[in-house]
Amino acid sequence: MTAWGEGRFGYDKEDIENEAVALAFSFFGGSTFLKEAIDKFMRILITGGAGFIGSHLCDKLLSEGHEVICMDNLITGDTANIDHIRDKRFSFIQYDVTNYIYADGKIDAILHFASPASPIDYLELPIQTLKVGSLGTHKALGLAKEKGARFLLASTSEVYGDPLIHPQKEDYWGNVNPIGPRGVYDEAKRFAEAITMAYHRYHKVDTRIVRIFNTYGPRMRLKDGRAIPTFIGQALKGEDVTVFGDGSQTRSFCYVSDLVEGIYRLLMSDITTPVNLG
């Protein structure tokens, strides 16, 4: 594959993204080349983009040449996660996606990552967790339908609840307690998956679903409530590392950059059924 800047016209990626350059080159028989180059890049909306995983996705998408609109109400997200981004193709909107979502211009893809995700957060914000999983997903899907955009839902391994099968394959329906304290997160994501598939089947929206397992890495809060940051926090304080139960339990852990690479590949794939990652 020819690298950017080494191709037929010797222009870099920013030049090719510029419509004026594309128009000028159309007079020199380069329109097909330029159209193919420009069409590779998308305008992508990420809800929950200031969160742990969402912010890493912003970085990944920008590195691939796409324009990114980051939307977050900052209930659990933090602008510190995106303050390092100094790219003219990046914009941030503070907004609650349980309300009607308006986005000017074309949107090629929507990645719906808005939701409290750690046990501490969804136990403190149970109603908000249910609302963003239901209303927020509905609003984001409505925008995808309006814009003709591809939609990727960030789901979770928690849709399996307390599984009776190990490891879980995507066709396993799970073992979930809908009225337990974790139920607000589990059921919000199960509903989100159901309405995503309904939009796919009824409205023909091009959808993807990723079921994310335990993820760790930079920008994760030490007081997140999950195992890895808890262990690290205890070690930094010189405390004993707490293991609940008899220690025989298993978890699937994934470094955030590996997860984000998998999410990006799923976004670019033709797979419309849920995919486990982590």
Identify the residue ranges that each predicted region occupies.
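Glycine-rich Rossmann NAD(P)(H)-binding loop
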Residues: 47, 215-219, 243-253, 268-271, ...
